[in-house]
Amino acid sequence: MQQYLDLMKHILAEGVDKSDRTGTGTRSVFGYQMRFDLSKGFPLVTTKKCHMRSIIHELLWFLKGDTNIAYLRENKVSIWDEWADENGDLGPVYGAQWRSWPTQSGDAIDQIAQVIAQIKSQPDSRRLIVSAWNVGELDKMALAPCHAFFQFYVADGKLSCQLYQRSCDVFLGLPFNIASYALLTMMVAQQCDLALGDFVWTGGDTHLYSNHMEQTALQLSREPRQLPTMTILRKPASIFDYQFEDFELTHYDPHPHIKAPVAV
């Protein structure tokens, strides 16, 4: 994935040094876009090994509407541990907003079910949108949504998706985010009987943490390898019925994992 390495180079060359909420410090650019043709391979970074099992389980957890890390812990996924309270709760984060956005009347909107119904019935709609950025509930969330807003687009029988990520940890978080939304696009396309188009990633505050610079240099020294293939082995009755075993990643030959600290 040369696009990802090019982003790192751009931040190092053009970025500005900024303070941040975690106190770690970043080198940051504002506004960046990458496009991945999903018909040409699954966009999983190859210049370091990425933990696809965690990515899949996290996405399934979002789609369940779950906001407690018990499911993740059961499946040996620890990426949310630092933000959960003593009971494993995170407040109304992604899953809650995707599946049960509260309304003034006391009802809840299932944005995922709604957008899939809209794609099927009104594929040319410009309102094929899901938002996790609920201003009225931000103060209840353990972490405000970083990948905040995504939109689907149908053309020539193909489904594309664009994500707006307001804040992006490029070294640790971004490979997960790209793979997660690429997989979500594949799932929605399958449910709507559409071919695969592009995944477009758009970043706001796009940064490398100051304690990731050595790791970034190591990654930039490596040559990207051929993208792997992701296969969905069955088509379940709905977007909410996928299981971990439904996904098969093949031809993934990454460089070794690179460890880096998480800024909390």
Swiss-Prot record:
Binding positions ((6R)-5,10-methylene-5,6,7,8-tetrahydrofolate): H51, D169, A263
Annotated signal sequence range: none
Reactions accelerated catalytically: dUMP + (6R)-5,10-methylene-5,6,7,8-tetrahydrofolate = 7,8-dihydrofolate + dTMP
Protein name: Thymidylate synthase
Domain of life: Bacteria
Catalytic residues in the record: C146 (nucleophile)
Single GO BP term: dTMP biosynthetic process
CDD domains noted in UniProt: TS_Pyrimidine_HMase (cd00351)
